[in-house]
Amino acid sequence: MSDKKNYYYNRELSWMDFNARVLEEAQKKDNPLMERLRFLAITGSNLDEFFMVRVAGVKSQIASNYTKPDDSGMTPKELLSALDKKTHAFMEKQYSCLYRSILPVLKKQAEIEFRTPEKLTPEQRAFTDEYFHRVLFPVLTPLAVDSSRPFPMLANKSLNLAVRLSSKENKGEKCFAVVQVPSILPRFTELPADGDTRCFILLEDIITDYLEELFELHEIKAVCPFRITRNSDLTIDEEADDFMYEIEKSIKRRKRGRPVRLELLQHTDEDTRKFLIKALNINESGIYEVQGPIDLTFFSKFANIPGCEKLCFAPIRSTTPPGDFFGYTDIFRAIREGDRLVHHPYETFDCVVQFIAQAAEDENVLAIKQTLYRVSGNSPIIASLIKAAENGKQVTVLVELKARFDEENNINWAKKLEKAGCHVIYGLTGLKTHCKIALVVRREEDGIRRYLHLGTGNYNDSTAKIYTDLGLFTCNEQFGADASSLFNVITGYSRPPEYKHFIVAPHGMRSFFEYMIRQETENAKKGLPSGITVKVNSLVDPKIIELLYEASKAGVRVQLIVRGICCLIPGIEGVSENITVMSIVGQLLEHSRIFRFENAGNPRIYMGSADWMPRNLDRRVELVFPIEDETQKARAFGILDTMLSDTTNARFMQSDTSYEHVDLRGKKKINSQLTFYHEAQARLKELQSIEKDSVLIPIHSAEE
C-alpha cells in the first residue's frame, strides 16, 4: 500500500487504548463497586506486563541504535516518546478514578474506608502496634546503603521504602536505607471498626509509622515508597542441549533484568529521588510519579473481602448438564452421537476435565495426546494425565515451556508428568506451540476410534471461569486423521502433511486466510454474496490488514470483533468504509477466535487458537478448524450474531482510532455475555425436562 503508515495504527498505542477501555469499566458508575476496583487492578497488572515486555523492547531497540520505522511509520524514539506521554496521562486517570469516583462511594454507600496512621482511633492504634511487633517486625530487614553495602537487588514489582537518614551520633552525616514491604504478607489489613465503618490500612503505612524502631541510632528525614518494573523478556538459546535447564537459567536472569520503570509518590523528597535514580541507573523517561498508593493491583484481592458480595457482579455460573455430559454419563457415547460445541464459561469447563478423566480410567482407551500452554496451579487435567500413565496408557503431552510468565509452572508440571511415565515434549525449536488439542485413541467393537477436543482457549480450569472460549468435541474420522498427523509433526520429525480439514500454522494458515479474504474480494466484484466476520483478540498483521482494505474497496462488508490491539483503521474514505471494528470489554474476558466467510452464499465458519498477528501466523504452532456439523454451525453463526448485537459492552473504533460506545437512543440494551448465560440456562432446563420425561415411574399397590 503506497501510504501504509496512514492506514496502520501503532500496536503499542492500540494496546494503551485497550487498557483505557478496561479503565472505563472501573469508571462506569453502573458497575458494582467492588468490580470497579477489580477493573482498576486489572489496568495496573496489564500495565506492569506491558512495561516488562513491550516498553522494555522499545528501550532495547533504542539502546542498540535501531532506527528503522515500524509499520505505522514510527521510529523507536518517537514511539517511546508517545508512550511516555500516553502512559503519564493514563496513570493520572487511574488515580483520578480511584479518588474521585470509587473511594468516596465506597465510604458513603458501603461504609468502607482506608485509613492512614494519623487518622486511627485509639483502638485501631493499639491494633497496629500489636500487629507491627508481633507480625511485621520479625520479617522486616532494613538494608543500609553505603560504600561497603551496595544498593540491594530488589525483586521485580516489589514495593519498597527508601529512607533518608541522619546519624544522631555523627551530626549531619546523611545516609540511605531500603526496607522492602514483605510481599508474603497481605497488602492491606482490616482494623477494628469505627462505629459502623469498616476500616483498612495499607502495610506500608504501618511500617512507615514504626520505622524509628528499625533505625534507633538515626533520625528519619524522609520516607519514600517506590517500586521498580524490570525488563522481563526472556532470551533463550533454543539449541541448548538441556532446554529445560536453559529456560530455568533464563528465568533467573529475568529476575535481574534492567529497570524500565520507577514508580514514586508525587512530591518525593528530592535527595531521595536523586539517590534512587542513580542507584537504579534509570533516566527521567522511566520515572512515573503517582498520587498513591503505588501498585493498584492489590485491589483485585481487596474486591474479594467477605461481606461485600452485593457489591460484586452476580456470578455467571457454568451450567452443568444432567449426568456428566449433555445428559449422558458416557462422554464417548455422547460424542459418537454427534459433534458437541461448548461455550465457556456459560457451559461448564468440567466437561473438558471429565473428558480426560474418563479417558484416564477407561480400560478401552489406548492413548491420550494433548498440548498444554497455560494450566492452573492445581490442574485436574494434569492429574488425570498422570493417572492415565499410571494405568498403563500411552500418554504424550506437549508442555510449552516458553509460555511467557508461566515458564516455572510449566517446568514443574513437565517434571511431574515425566516422573509419572508420560512422554513429554517441551515444544519445537524456534516456535511456540499454542494450539489447543486433546486426542483420545479408544478401542471399540468396530475398531479404533479417535475422539477429539479442539479449543480456542487454554486447558486451564481456573481461567475458564472468567474467559469466554469455545470447544468442539468430535470423533469425525478425518478430523482424527488430521489430529494424528499434527501430533506426529509435533513429537517427531514428520513433514507437515496436507491436512484434510485442519488449518495449521506456521505451514498453511497464513496462505489459507489470505486466500479466503481474496476469495471474498473476488466474489464481491462478481456480484456474488460476500462478507467477512471475524472475532480475535488482536489484529496486527500488515498483510492481512492490507487484504481487508482491498476487500472493503471491492464492497465486501467486513465486521471485526477485536478485544485488544487493532492496527487496522476502519472508516477511512476510499479504503475502509465497509469495515467496522468492535471491542467487547465486560464482566468476562473475551478470548475465543471465530472466522466466518460468506463464500458466495455457502457460509463457512472456523474456530481456533490463532489471532491475526505475525507471531501466530508465522512463529507459532496454531490450529484453526472448521465447524461442519450443521446444528453446531448454526449455533456458531448465532454466537457471532449475538456479539455483533451487543450495545452494553461494545465500543466501536472510529477513523481517528478513538473508541465510542453504542448510541442507545432507539435501541434495545443488549449485553451479549448475559444473553449467552440466559441461553445456556434455558438449554439446561430443556435437557432436564427431557431427562425427567424419559424416566419411567412404576405404579405400586396401595399396600406398598
Where are these regions (language model features)?
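Glycine/threonine-rich ATP-lid/beta-loop region of ATP-binding domains
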Residues: 542-545, 549
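Hydrophobic alpha/beta core scaffold segments
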Residues: 557-561
